[in-house]
Amino acid sequence: MKPVIALVGRPNVGKSTLFNRLTRSRDALVADLPGLTRDRHYGEGRVGERPYLVVDTGGFEPVAKDGILHEMARQTRQAVEEADVVVFIVDGRNGLAPQDKSIADYLRKTGRPIFLVVNKAEGMKYTAVATDFYELGLGDPRAISAAHGDGVTDMINEALEVAYAGQPEEADDNDPSRGIKIAIVGRPNVGKSTLVNALIGEDRVIAFDMPGTTRDSIYVDFERNGKKYTLIDTAGLRRRGKVFEAIEKFSVVKTLQSISDANVVILLLDAQQDISDQDAHIAGFVVEQGRALVIGVNKWDGLDDHARDRAKADLTRKLKFLDFAKSHYISAAKKTGIGALMRSVDDAYAAAMAKLPTPKLTRALIEAVEFQQPRRRGPVRPKLRYAHQGGQNPPLIVIHGNALDAVTETYKRYLENRFRETFSLTGTPLRIEFRSSNNPYADKG
């Protein structure tokens, strides 16, 4: 699984600035999705071919006893426990603060690799910036400027060397012999453990720990209707005898790792509860990761017709950026609707792995343009000439032509819908990339 880097520090030391710098390339993928809440504190970064998850823990007050500061401290401690590397950020402008010492005392006891980072160091000599912070006993401070990017690349490369050293080798994500890897995600008490047990049945369970990290993940292999699947543990499912029960602890880190590791994600919602920001955050990360998705609305049997209509309207309004995914209204406890849910899992995986021939893609593109041309931007109208597939899981369609920077987001969504309809790409995010032609004769004739 992707390693996790937790950003820790007292308020206003620049954690969010560093987070935004580390994750900006990923944020761009979901920036224009309507209905998506943007105030996330977790995301993906990438250096070369090495992806990683990064968690901004919020301002850390380790001695807070109650209220919102206590809750923030609890969440921070959990993130630190589950991180591969902790980046402890201090403020080079304001110098060493008593809170820094308290946080350092706590971090030393965790046993986690700690990178002490002095932020806001632009324009200052290293000795002037670093001297005070040696007192924390966390080794040599690394001076950076999150706002300007100075020192950030070197720091994150060092952190990733440590983080990846503890990661086990992973098998090919798309190896068909392993079966479809499914992550069932959702906030606490939506019925994840009930759905797991409904899917696997008590007599077909093979559970084993994958060693190699301090957070061993449980993978459960099972067959259903002759097809192989692997369930990935998400947020505290643990085997108790022959069934799985949910430990009452929601882990953002485990959820993000499971989404990243999966072929298909089942986002489980509680029909009897309004959709929350947390649901939207999880859904946004699924889209950002490009994972195939099926929505399960659980506890449907407990609603009357009026409540069902209200729940459907809530889903449409708050998660409209998931309109590519099928929704199923189920009861995990009564095992109703699960067959259709799993058929959509199969369909979503098939769509994510679909091979799209260049001639058919180009024909679909030409037909879409003939039906509705892109708008002009000033005197220029984009010319879309041909398309080919640039990747799978999720499908990437690369469109070639001229003046493609003038293509609007509205027209891009129009093309996406046309491709989805033509190739039955339900259940998977779809990426479209425009590449302007370098052919000097492209506009001739």
From Swiss-Prot:
Residues that, per the record, bind GTP 1: 9-16, 56-60, 119-122
Q: What residue stretches are annotated with the EngA-type G domain?
A: 3-167, 180-353
- The UniProt record gives the binding positions of GTP 2 as 186-193, 233-237, 298-301
GO MF term set: ATP hydrolysis activity; GTP binding; ribosome binding
**Keywords assigned by UniProt?**
GTP-binding, Nucleotide-binding, Repeat, Ribosome biogenesis
Name one matching Pfam family.
MMR_HSR1
Which residue numbers delimit the KH-like domain?
354-438
One GO BP annotation here?
ribosome biogenesis
Task performed by this protein = GTPase that plays an essential role in the late steps of ribosome biogenesis.
Q: How does it assemble?
A: Associates with the 50S ribosomal subunit.
Note the NCBIfam families from the entry.
GTPase_EngA (TIGR03594), small_GTP (TIGR00231)
Supply the name of the protein.
GTPase Der
Give the gene that encodes this protein.
Answer: der
